[in-house]
């Protein structure tokens, strides 16, 4: 005969199992699909053009566990006759979950010996009343100083901190969605100043504007893409 305690325990286990099943994502959202970042991001952006360079801090090392986070990456140096050079890294991962998630620059720069300071939120104005949240920070090593401006996209959300990123993933999980994600990072080697960060933001705005409307969701998600389209941008 099954006693009352066993019945209660069994009921609790069934409830827990049902809750776990409800929180198990079932729909995988991928905005890149079969396309390549190399083809999406123009080699000429405003009055900047790409030039070969090896001066990059990449978000992963080939063959490492973190390399599993990213299915596609692009690293380019853009130079301009009348502005600062801009190093651009775009890293895309088609799976964002508890085991695999984007590494924010605060993590990957610190991992190779940089000190992180002056981390502040900012925005790119993509069109009238259309703003993209970004984060600005300074990475310093013995050999160089890098002002950095970056954003991350998880599904259709644009978290600017690690805690926001974790909260977004939980919300997506509750909604039954397995999101993709992208890191877009712009930096230069210079002493940090308002003028330098302003140029990084200007480059970021020009980069989004230069990407075809059909490809913009890969970098900024469908909501901001639709808002830009509605604003005529």
Go through the PLM ranges and name each one.
Residues 232-233:
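Short, solvent-exposed mixed-charge patches
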Residues 68-202, 206-218, 222, 227-228:
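A cross-kingdom signal targeting lumenal/periplasmic-facing segments of multi-pass membrane
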Residues 18-30:
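Membrane-interface motif at the C-terminal end of an N-terminal transmembrane signal
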Residues 12-13, 41, 200:
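Active-site-proximal structural scaffolding
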Residues 28-41:
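Alpha-helical transmembrane signal-anchor/signal-peptide segments
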Residues 35-37, 60-65, 73-77:
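Short secondary-structure capping/turn segments at boundaries of alpha-helices and beta-strands
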Residues 41-67:
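Short extracytoplasmic
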Residues 1-15:
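N-terminal secretory signal peptides and thylakoid transit peptides that target proteins
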């Amino acid at each position: 005969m099954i006693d009352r305690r066993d019945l209660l325990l069994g009921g609790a286990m069934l409830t827990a199992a049902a809750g776990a099943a409800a929180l198990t994502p079932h729909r995988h959202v991928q905005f890149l699909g079969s396309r390549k970042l190399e083809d999406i991001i123009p080699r000429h952006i405003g009055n900047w053009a790409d030039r070969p360079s090896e001066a990059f801090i990449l978000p992963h090392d080939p063959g490492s566990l973190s390399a599993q986070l990213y299915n596609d990456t692009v690293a380019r140096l853009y130079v301009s006759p009348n502005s600062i050079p801009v190093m651009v890294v775009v890293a895309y991962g088609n799976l964002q979950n508890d085991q695999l998630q984007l590494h924010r620059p605060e993590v990957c720069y610190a991992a190779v010996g940089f000190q992180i300071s002056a981390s502040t939120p900012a925005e790119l104005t993509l069109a009238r009343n259309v703003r993209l949240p970004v984060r600005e920070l300074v990475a310093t090593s013995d050999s160089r100083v890098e002002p950095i401006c970056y954003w991350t996209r998880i599904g259709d959300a644009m978290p600017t901190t690690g805690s926001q990123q974790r909260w977004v993933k939980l919300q997506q999980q509750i909604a039954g969605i397995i999101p993709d994600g992208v890191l877009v990072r712009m930096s230069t080697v210079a002493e940090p100043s308002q003028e330098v960060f302003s140029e990084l933001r200007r480059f970021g705005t020009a980069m989004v504007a230069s990407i075809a409307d059909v490809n913009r969701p890969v970098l900024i998600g469908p909501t901001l893409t639709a808002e830009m389209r509605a604003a005529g941008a």
